Amino acid sequence: MVLLLNIQGLDEAHDIVLPYSWPLPAFTGPPIPNSPACKESQYCHAMVHRLEGPNLGELGMYGYDNACFWFGKTGYHHLFPKVLKRCTEIAENYEDGKTYLSYISKEAWNPDDFTMLCKKAIANNDKELWKYCNEVTNMEWHLLFQECNKITNSVR
């Protein structure tokens, strides 16, 4: 999955997470019920769509909108407090970091708020904000992949 994301293989990355995150048969095959990493797969699914951004994707939805749909399916994830903490730390390295954080809840990580911040960066062609969004997204992927590795390697 990491390799696919690094080479812009969003469709291929999507095909990997779909059976783990969608309960119905799809073109990628039957669903894989009761996966220990189901919640993480939903989280990955949402992030793949966030990377689609303003592009039209699955089911005629734009990436940002589809990301919000999948974050809704994911619900709360125990990584959210760590993501919020790290996102705040990353913002300290940016001149407009406090402004960036004003769009994000200080109480709890809201992935939809961050998705809309990414959308704003693209819409306004704000290169510095886009750089911040990419840095936070990369951190988020890193935490999520660590979590998936921990979950799948602890299953015996």
Question: What positions do the PLM features span?
Answer:
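Non-catalytic amphipathic alpha-helical adaptor/oligomerization segments
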Residues: 1-132, 136-144, 153-156
